[in-house]
Amino acid sequence: MELLLNPSLFSLLSLLFFVIFLFKRLYASPTCQRKVPPSPPKLPVVGNLHQVGSLPHRSLQSLSKKYGPLMLLHFGSVPVLVASSAEAAREIMKNHDVVFSTRPKSNISDKLTYGSKDVAFSPYGEYWRRVRSICVNHLLSNQRVKSFRHIMEEETRKMIENINERCVSSSLPVNLSDFTITLTNSIICTMAFGRKHCDVENMRKIKAMLAGFEEILSVFDAGDYIPWLAWVNRFTGLDDRLGKLAKQGDELVEGVIEEHMKRKKAEGQRYDAADQAKGTDFMDILLDIYQGRVPGFALDRDSVKAVILDMFTGGTDTIYTSIDWTIAELLRHPMVLKKLHTEVREVAQGKSEITEEDLGKMAYLKVVIKETLRLHPPIPLLLPRESTQDISIMGYHISAGTQVIVNAWAIGRDPLYWENAEEFRPERFMDGNMDFRGFNFEYIPFGAGRRSCPALAFAIAVVELTIAKLVHKFDFTLPDGGKPEDLDMTEASGTTVHKQLPNVANVVATRN
């Protein structure tokens, strides 16, 4: 105390503290001096994880209303940028797409996809460009999708027949969700593996595998965000579940690979790139690339498995979810359903089957699906990206290594872009100026930029055909005199957000 009362010493200490303060101000990290996006208060260790909730797209939308369309959260020790406006999405997925095109490392996706050798989770780089090119040019091109159209038509025909049989055998309401999930599984399985592998037993295994994948991909892995807590996975059972699921997927796909290779060897079959119309399945195409029969492309065995599993996990769930929400909105809006009935039946003109040409004339069908996907994008929070360098976005500094989440669900309901945003109004798309391809950033149900969904054309083709055939063949009403406005539209939690309860309706076959 006496030392502090010494005027000379006090002056010297004051000067020293001032110099230290000045030094810190002058030489502090540039990041500290730069303007960063607004953030809600965070807790020690967990950061903002406690604010995410079971439906994160809704929680993050709520936070964005308070903190802005570009906000910075912390999930554990990881900075996470959340974009909730079209302007912010455009900055990330168009203006600075290359900087934000990689994926953050994920323990779960790494284990399920052979070290992220698939398309969805692979980090941005030469390998990702190669596998995406294979998917776009060899598996999911417009020509390839057309060559698989007979599969879509056959499987939807089977679905219609099965619903008819169910209506004949029982007057009870029909669980439409059961029929549509079976449909999407069958279409993807036949396209990926060939019809031989889509018998009842294999479909049971595939359905169980997909359910497991979907569940575990939605699990929070503490080690990804709080590295020193990674050991917890051993005690929660996550590591064990993950190992079993990865083995289950590997054994299933490996069995299909072995069968295809034996058959190709015995029959001398090979993929002819000049003849896209052949009934070749995805596995045949990928194995020809693996065996060096397609010039300019190369894949190892694990990559073949990872890409095939991508087709299942990405394709089945998103397509089924889109169909399911469309049916729900039609049941909830009888006047829209009536208008769609009229269009489909006028275009079909009494024919027993709807053709591809017919679908091209169904303008109202297309806007019904667009409006459904505006309100219910299958993956509301687009798969996370990661910044590869320091960058400035909308006047804010974003550090390299920041994870980025684009809230497509919030953007699709933003009243700044959508009049009466919470209402289901297909007519808003009738001017035809907006599509799914990610050019309009107020509407990005399938993402945009380099990381947009490569299966977009295929997914929309399946959804359109399914809804058109259901509306063509059946009339639907809610059971027990239920009021449309009372239909439960509660969402289930998950990476892909389903309707929590299945769509159940009274179904009556029409005379065409």
Curated annotation (Swiss-Prot):
The reaction(s) annotated as catalysed by this protein in its Swiss-Prot or TrEMBL entry are: norfluorocurarine + reduced [NADPH--hemoprotein reductase] + O2 = 18-hydroxynorfluorocurarine + oxidized [NADPH--hemoprotein reductase] + H2O + H(+)
Binding positions for heme?
Answer: 453
Needs which cofactor? Answer: heme
Q: What is its main location?
A: membrane
Q: Which Gene3D superfamilies match?
A: Cytochrome P450
The domain of life for this entry's organism is: Eukaryota
Membrane topology per the entry is:
Single-pass membrane protein
InterPro entries listed in its UniProt record: Cyt_P450 (IPR001128), Cyt_P450_CS (IPR017972), Cyt_P450_E_grp-I (IPR002401), Cyt_P450_sf (IPR036396)
Q: Where are the transmembrane segments?
A: 3-23
- Enumerate the subcellular locations listed in this protein's record, separating them with semicolons: Membrane
- Function in brief: Monooxygenase involved in the biosynthesis of curare monoterpene indole alkaloids (MIAs), natural products such as strychnine, a neurotoxic compound used as a pesticide to control rodents, and its pharmacologically active derivatives, including brucine, used to regulate blood pressure. Curare alkaloids act as animal glycine receptor antagonists. Catalyzes the conversion of norfluorocurarine to 18-OH norfluorocurarine.
PANTHER family membership: CYTOCHROME P450 71A2-LIKE, CYTOCHROME P450 FAMILY 71 PROTEIN
Q: What is this protein called?
A: Norfluorocurarine oxidase
Tell me what organism the protein belongs to.
Answer: Strychnos nux-vomica
